[in-house]
Amino acid sequence: MTAVLSLGSNLGDRLAHLRLGVHVLAARAVSPVYETAPVGGIEQPDFLNVVVLCDLDAGQAWARAQEAERLAGRVRAVRWGPRTLDVDVVWADGDEPGIELPHPRAHERAFVLIPWLDVDPDAVLPGYGPVAGLAVDRDGLSRLGPL
């Protein structure tokens, strides 16, 4: 079983928050870090993003994502607002009530798809096909290096 999760941080020590998330998720593969502009129209600092692969089913991935956000001090004050750590389950084996899989906006987000290809060049997004074939706007996406 494999889960694909996207992590982002734009508050505080962004790298430390990402490292915490990677640790809590027990990731077996971690993409390079990318810096991206925020999505959603709210003025805020840029994000650092990574994608990880984990040996978790959908329920386990969701539970660990919530735990990582809690440990990083995530406060849900404004939708698409700034956050210490945001962890999205992009895809995972199994069903979990309340989780829409694949993530409903994954196919249009370069900060998910490009790092995903770094850890799995043959990745397939169910319902959309090979990730390498999805057209996404890479403007504003900067690869920084390893976490």
Task: Show the residue positions of the predicted features.
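N-terminal beta1-alpha1 ligand-phosphate binding loop
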Residues: M1-A37
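Conserved hydrophobic/aromatic beta-strand scaffold that supports enzyme active sites
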Residues: V4, N49-L53, L113
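Flexible, gly/pro- and Lys/Arg-enriched active-site loops
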Residues: S31-L48, G59-L147
